[in-house]
Curated annotation (Swiss-Prot):
Pfam families linked to this entry: Gp_dh_C (PF02800), Gp_dh_N (PF00044)
Protein name: D-erythrose-4-phosphate dehydrogenase
Catalytic activity: D-erythrose 4-phosphate + NAD(+) + H2O = 4-phospho-D-erythronate + NADH + 2 H(+)
Known role: Catalyzes the NAD-dependent conversion of D-erythrose 4-phosphate to 4-phosphoerythronate.
Cellular localisation: Cytoplasm
EC number: 1.2.1.72
Positions of NAD(+) binding: R12, I13, N318
Quaternary structure annotation from Swiss-Prot or TrEMBL: Homotetramer.
Positions of the catalytic residues: C155
Family label: Belongs to the glyceraldehyde-3-phosphate dehydrogenase family. Epd subfamily.
Residues at the site labelled Activates thiol group during catalysis: H182
Lineage, opening ranks: Bacteria, Pseudomonadati, Pseudomonadota, Gammaproteobacteria, Enterobacterales
Length: 338
C-alpha cells in the first residue's frame, strides 16, 4: 500500500524531503499528495528546482496555479496559516510530515489529527509529551500502532546518538561533552539585524557564533540513563550546509584508537549500514554535502587520552541526511498500521 503524505512547511527540510523521496526511488512506497506553505506557489516551485546547497533538481518541475508537478506527479499546493483549516481528511492523508519548524507540541499534533491526518511526524524534537521521539536505526523498532504523534528528533541528535550507542555498548560511557559546529541557519541575518539573542544579531557570514542548543536534552530523551551526564554547546560557522560534531566521552574500559575505529568502521558496514558511514580520507565539510547518512565518522580525527577519554569527529549533512531519516521513519510509522 502506498503511504499518502502531506508536507507542512516547505523550507530547507520540507524541500529536502521531497527531493530525497524522488532521488532515492521511493515513489512506489510514498506519495506526496499536498504541500502547505505560506509562500507563493511560484516561489515554492523555483526553490525546489534550484538549490544553492544541493544543486538543480534532476526531475522536471513545473507549477500551474496551485498545483506542483514533479515529473508526471501532481501535488496540491495549500497556503493555510491554521492547521485546523487543512483538508487532510478530504485528501486522504496518512501521515503529515510537519517540517514547519513552528509546530511541535502535542496540541499541534492533535490539530493535524483533527484535520483528518492519521499520524504526524515532526521534523524537530517537539515537546516531551509526544507519543515517541525516534532516532531511526537506534530506537525506531519501539514504534507502535498507537504512536500517532511522533518526533524525528533533530539532525544533530540523529548524527550523534548512533555513535554514542556504539561507544557505550562497547566501552561503557561515564559522561561526555558535545560541541556542534553547525552551518548557518535561516534565523541568522545576512547583515547585522535585531534578534532577541544578541549573538544572532550579527552577520552570519562574518563570525563564528555561539548559540544555545538543546542537544544534551535530545541525548537524554533517547538515553535517559545519561541525565546530568552529558553537556553540549554549539557554534554556527559561515558555511551554508554540513555540520561537524566533536564528541568527547569518558569510558570505563581502557581503549585505544585502533579499537575505536575498528568498532565504528565495522558498524558502518553491518549494524548501522545506511545510517552511519566511516572514512579515513582527508575530506572537508563540502565533501559531505548531499550525503544521506545520519553520521559519517572521521577516523583520522579519533583520539584517546589516558586510555579512558575518547574524542571523535562526526560529520553530517544536516539537511539531506535528516530528510532521508524522515522518510525512513515515515515508512516505519506506516508499517505499524493506522
Amino acid at each position: 500500500m502506498t503511504i499518502r503524505i502531506a508536507i507542512n512547511g516547505f523550507g530547507r527540510i520540507g524541500r529536502s524531503v521531497l527531493r530525497a523521496l524522488y532521488e532515492s526511488g521511493r515513489r512506489a512506497e510514498i506519495t506526496v499528495v499536498a504541500i502547505n506553505e505560506l509562500a507563493s506557489a511560484e516561489g515554492m516551485a523555483h526553490l525546489l528546482k534550484y538549490d544553492s546547497s544541493h544543486g538543480r533538481f534532476s526531475w522536471d518541475v513545473r507549477q500551474e496555479c496551485d498545483q506542483l508537478y514533479v515529473g508526471d506527479d501532481c501535488i496540491r499546493l495549500l497556503h493555510q496559516a491554521e492547521i485546523q483549516a487543512l483538508p487532510w481528511r478530504e485528501l486522504g492523508v496518512d501521515i503529515v510530515l510537519d517540517c514547519s519548524g513552528v509546530y511541535g507540541s502535542r496540541e499541534d499534533g492533535e490539530a493535524h489529527l483533527a484535520a483528518g491526518a492519521k499520524k504526524v511526524l515532526f521534523s524537530h524534537p517537539g515537546t516531551a509529551d509526544l507519543d515517541a521521539t525516534v532516532v531511526f536505526g537506534v530506537n525506531h523498532q519501539q514504534l507502535e500502532r498507537e504512536h500517532r504523534i511522533v518526533s524525528n528528533a533533530s539532525c544533530t541528535t540523529n548524527c550523534i546518538i548512533p555513535v554514542i550507542k556504539l561507544l557505550d555498548d562497547a566501552f561503557g560511557i561515564e559522561n561526555g561533552t558535545v560541541t556542534t559546529i553547525h552551518s548557518s541557519m535561516n534565523d541568522q541575518p545576512v547583515i547585522d539585524a535585531y534578534h532577541h539573542d544578541l549573538r544572532r544579531t550579527r552577520a552570519a557570514s562574518q563570525s563564528i557564533i555561539p548559540v544555545d542548543t538543546k542537544l544534551s536534552a535530545g541525548i537524554t530523551r533517547i538515553f535517559p540513563q545519561f541525565v546530568d551526564r552529558f553537556e553540549a554547546i554549539s557554534v554556527r560557522v559561515p558555511t551554508i550546509n554540513v555540520t561537524a560534531i566533536d564528541l568527547s566521552v569518558s569510558v570505563r574500559k581502557a581503549v585505544n584508537v585502533n579499537e575505536i575505529n575498528a568498532l565504528l568502521q565495522k558498524s558502518a558496514h553491518e549494524s548501522f549500514r545506511g545510517i552511519v558511514d566511516y572514512t579515513e580520507l582527508p575530506l572537508v565539510s563540502a565533501d559531505f554535502n548531499h550525503d544521506p547518512h545520519s553520521a559519517i565518522v572521521d577516523g583520522t580525527q579519533t583520539r584517546v587520552s589516558g586510555q579512558h577519554l575518547i574524542k571523535t569527529l562526526v560529520w553530517c549533512d544536516n539537511e539531506w541526511g535528516f530528510a532521508n531519516r524522515m522518510l525512513d521513519t515515515t515508512r516505519a510509522m506506516a508499517a505499524c498500521g493506522f
